[in-house]
Amino acid sequence: MRRGKSIVLSLLLWHFPVWAACPDWSPARANDEIARLQQQLAQWNDSYWQQGVSAVDDSVYDQLSAQLVQWQRCFGGDTGAELAPPVSGSLPHPVPHTGVRKLADKQAVQQWMRKRSDLWVQPKVDGVAVTLVYRDGRLVSAISRGNGLKGEDWTQKVRLIPAVPQSTKGALANSTLQGEIFLLHDNHIQRQMGGMNARSKVAGMMMRQNNTSSLQSLSVFIWAWPDGPATMPERLRQLSGAGFGFAQQYSQPVKSADDVERVRTAWWTTGLPFVTDGVVVRTGKEPEARHWMPGQGDWLVAWKYPPVAKVAEVTGVQFAVGKSGKISVVASLAPVMLDDKRVKRVNVGSVRRWEEWDIAPGDHILVSLAGQGIPRIDKVVWRSTQRDKPAPPGNRYNALTCFYATEVCQEQFIARLVWLGSKEALEVDGMGEAGWRVLHQAHRFEHIFSWLALTQEQLQATPGFSKEKSKQLWHQFNLVRHRPFIRWVMAMGIPLTQGALKANGDRSWGQLLARTAEYWQQLPTTGEGRARRVIQWRDNPEIRALGNWLAARHINGFSP
């Protein structure tokens, strides 16, 4: 149950590595940031518990709760005051809910298992926790988890769930059961489909009035029978015989962390009848019920699945200038792991898009992986009290700027080098942005073709370049000198498609310079506007100077 898990501080801290840095804030700002986040979490909490409405995704709430705890620890605040759910329920649990401690990784699971035996793994079903009380073979009470000690009376609602047995016999005739009410699914694959806000949906169904029909889609997974049969197999057998079949179907004995990992992966990647957010490892033998207390269930632990999306703090905002002068915005992040990818940066988009997002350093954004593992922003989930946003560059850049290196042209100049080295232009194999930056920093290029003037000795003397790397690059530069004329023109940024240039058929710089706008307009995919841009490009002094420089180096098509 989402908010109920907050009763134990340590349960939240799995979201943050132990090395998470404390913010460099003044005491006044720290108090302000903490108070605002506490207030927001309290509002979400109230909406969730009192109205059954989730104003924020479960995972976002959990991660921001963990962030609050970290800030409180950094600045000496009370880490427990605001974390418990509001308790409107007054019905005591016959046996308290202990909660489950979360472990960060396989190594932690292995450590926990080391001195324990008779271990079992179960899915960590994503729903809302409940106590079911049977007396004389009848369901007499159903209690929401609440704060683990007291909760809401859900008896009438639970009696309307067909999947919950209304009567029991044998040892279960007088029993207290703890479990998870969940929304039934047909082959839910957690890795592909994510959590689907399952907890909030179930909570809403249990809170709202006049929704009898929706309760038909709920079921229950029993994960605890306090003071029940002494062995796990016997508990599971009797539960299954009474109509609580999911526990037996989805409980497996394990002897090692490898076993747990195998089952965890299988349940993460195959279809299940419920949403899960990890697995629970527990001992078959449990303490007597009189010893159960919230936060003290040391006989079970959880190993959660990696979230589909994670909340990341924005540590900086940078502006990148592309080869055509287009400005894009990149947000630097406090590193987060998504799948096996360490994400430190995310593309925001254009300046206009950045302004629409209203992202500043200190904000927290929800980040996920799009196609091909590219990080993307899903939403801004929390904004810092201080809005120190950098000013974007002015309108100094366009498609005809930065062919020559100047102090204000560094980013667009590098972007032009990256472009000319790409397969669409000169295809300088083995050279990416990092390599061009190293070369430019070491040899202070005057313009985008200055690298052609480098000697083999200069390449070998470039810091960070091995002898082998320098030799390969020298070979590449010599190959590039013989690229077709059309490739060089593409490298110079002519605003035409390669198809239009091929249709043109010019093989010399002189021919190309002599063409009129009317001529260019007749080529495929070249309208009046593009033809006009070609003439502007042709007449640009820097382009003319580059053409002369290439002619002096006897490059194909440029020599008289």
Curated annotation (Swiss-Prot):
Catalytic activity annotation: NAD(+) + (deoxyribonucleotide)n-3'-hydroxyl + 5'-phospho-(deoxyribonucleotide)m = (deoxyribonucleotide)n+m + AMP + beta-nicotinamide D-nucleotide
MF terms from GO for this chain are: DNA ligase (NAD+) activity
Enzyme Commission code = 6.5.1.2
What keywords were assigned to this record? DNA damage, DNA repair, DNA replication, Ligase, NAD
Give start-end ranges for the coiled-coil region(s): none
**Its GO biological process terms?**
DNA repair; DNA replication
Gene3D superfamilies per UniProt: 5' to 3' exonuclease, C-terminal subdomain, DNA ligase/mRNA capping enzyme, Helix hairpin bin, Nucleic acid-binding proteins
Please list the residues that make up the active site: K124 (n6-amp-lysine intermediate)
Its job: Catalyzes the formation of phosphodiester linkages between 5'-phosphoryl and 3'-hydroxyl groups in double-stranded DNA using NAD as a coenzyme and as the energy source for the reaction.
Family label:
Belongs to the NAD-dependent DNA ligase family. LigB subfamily.
Q: Which PANTHER family match?
A: DNA LIGASE (PTHR47810), DNA LIGASE B (PTHR47810:SF1)
> What is this protein identified as?
DNA ligase B
Query: What organism is the protein native to?
Result: Citrobacter koseri (strain ATCC BAA-895 / CDC 4225-83 / SGSC4696)
Query: Gene encoding this chain?
Result: ligB
